[in-house]
Amino acid sequence: NIKQHNLKKTLKEIILQDYKQVKILEKIIHPFVRKEMKKFSINNQRKKMVFYEIPLLIESNLMKHFDIIIFIKAKKKIRLNRFLDKGGEKKMFNLLNKRQFSDIKKAKFSDHIVVNEKNLNILKKNLSGIISKYV
């Protein structure tokens, strides 16, 4: 969608020019995200399991909304390369990375930790092992 692409591009430009704008953007975006999260939960309440992928879950103090937290981690260099492969810029990666807690701190709030430094098949296998404990 061209409109979404242009919005993302504009937001990136704002963030790169003045990182302090992130706080303002978060105050606008986070209530909407939480509303969508709640709607998703309601629409899926009959399912045995529901999965969310939430950047900055712990940093945003959203842990209380979930029964199980799986922390998927990778070395900074690997995360940077993946970000660049998706068309991201190193400066943006560094700005976003600063917002994250350390792996040690995130691990304290996690029920499971999965290292994601290989390929998607290995990640899926590791996640399947965890999920099978709850089915």
Mark where each language-model region is.
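Residue-level signature of catalytic and energy-coupling elements of molecular machines
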Residues: 25, 51, 114
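ATP-dependent NMP and nucleoside kinases share a basic, alpha-helical "lid"
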Residues: 36-43, 49-85
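Residue-level recognition of specific faces of alpha-helices
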Residues: 21-24, 53, 68, 95
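Amphipathic alpha-helical segments within well-ordered protein domains
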Residues: 12-13, 26, 80, 84, ...
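ATP-dependent small-molecule kinase phosphotransfer cores
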Residues: 1-46
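Small-molecule kinase domains that catalyze NTP-dependent phosphoryl transfer to phosphate-bearing small molecules
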Residues: 33-37, 64-65, 76, 86-135
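Active-site-adjacent beta-strand anchor residues
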Residues: 26-27, 72-73, 116
